[in-house]
Amino acid sequence: MARFQEFYKEKVVPGLIEKFGYKSVMEVPRITKITLNMGLGEAVADKKVIENAVGDLTKIAGQKPVVTKARKAIAGFKIRQGYPIGAMVTLRGRAMYEFLDRFVTVALPRVRDFRGVSGRAFDGRGNYNIGVKEQIIFPEIDYDKIDALRGLNISITTTAKTDDEAKALLASFKFPFRN
């Protein structure tokens, strides 16, 4: 069992039951999945960009990402339908908790001028989104072997009904909120 998964069962669940007064353990919000998405508009000109991004995401997530393709053509961006324009990977279960552990304890502290993550990035339904500007904050990425700095979006989906419940859940996982 992953370290954060054990931590969730032993510390987070009792803490949230006490804070919100849930009657059942099944009412306690939990993280269902974490989605990592990398949009690669520059992949239209160079096909190597997709390969390098897929390699980076594989190292970060520990599983192979899916290459996302354009749904429709956009002449202004020189994109045709079916062109590869991004990569995404969905993590669940053990891999999700392992990634969350690495992200909170190792990757976030490596961000330059880090003062905490925004507490306003919730969507109103208990899900949280974080934008990472550089993939080099992850220790799996070798700085000397990357071709370009790429950002990625990390979307954390929870079963929480409100943003307050989701924020309490993530805060109990030691998420460094600044507000």
Swiss-Prot record:
<dbReference type="GO" id="GO:0003735">
    <property type="term" value="F:structural constituent of ribosome"/>
</dbReference>
<dbReference type="GO" id="GO:1990904">
    <property type="term" value="C:ribonucleoprotein complex"/>
</dbReference>
<dbReference type="InterPro" id="IPR002132">
    <property type="entry name" value="Ribosomal_uL5"/>
</dbReference>
<keyword id="KW-0689">Ribosomal protein</keyword>
<keyword id="KW-0687">Ribonucleoprotein</keyword>
<comment type="similarity">
    <text>Belongs to the universal ribosomal protein uL5 family.</text>
</comment>
<protein>
    <recommendedName>
        <fullName>Large ribosomal subunit protein uL5</fullName>
    </recommendedName>
</protein>
<dbReference type="InterPro" id="IPR031310">
    <property type="entry name" value="Ribosomal_uL5_N"/>
</dbReference>
<comment type="function">
    <text>This is one of the proteins that bind and probably mediate the attachment of the 5S RNA into the large ribosomal subunit, where it forms part of the central protuberance. In the 70S ribosome it contacts protein S13 of the 30S subunit (bridge B1b), connecting the 2 subunits; this bridge is implicated in subunit movement. Contacts the P site tRNA; the 5S rRNA and some of its associated proteins might help stabilize positioning of ribosome-bound tRNAs.</text>
</comment>
<dbReference type="Pfam" id="PF00673">
    <property type="entry name" value="Ribosomal_L5_C"/>
</dbReference>
<keyword id="KW-0694">RNA-binding</keyword>
<keyword id="KW-0820">tRNA-binding</keyword>
<dbReference type="InterPro" id="IPR031309">
    <property type="entry name" value="Ribosomal_uL5_C"/>
</dbReference>
<dbReference type="GO" id="GO:0000049">
    <property type="term" value="F:tRNA binding"/>
</dbReference>
<dbReference type="GO" id="GO:0019843">
    <property type="term" value="F:rRNA binding"/>
</dbReference>
<dbReference type="Pfam" id="PF00281">
    <property type="entry name" value="Ribosomal_L5"/>
</dbReference>
<dbReference type="InterPro" id="IPR020930">
    <property type="entry name" value="Ribosomal_uL5_bac-type"/>
</dbReference>
<dbReference type="GO" id="GO:0006412">
    <property type="term" value="P:translation"/>
</dbReference>
<keyword id="KW-0699">rRNA-binding</keyword>
<dbReference type="InterPro" id="IPR020929">
    <property type="entry name" value="Ribosomal_uL5_CS"/>
</dbReference>
<dbReference type="InterPro" id="IPR022803">
    <property type="entry name" value="Ribosomal_uL5_dom_sf"/>
</dbReference>
<comment type="subunit">
    <text>Part of the 50S ribosomal subunit; part of the 5S rRNA/L5/L18/L25 subcomplex. Contacts the 5S rRNA and the P site tRNA. Forms a bridge to the 30S subunit in the 70S ribosome.</text>
</comment>
<dbReference type="GO" id="GO:0005840">
    <property type="term" value="C:ribosome"/>
</dbReference>
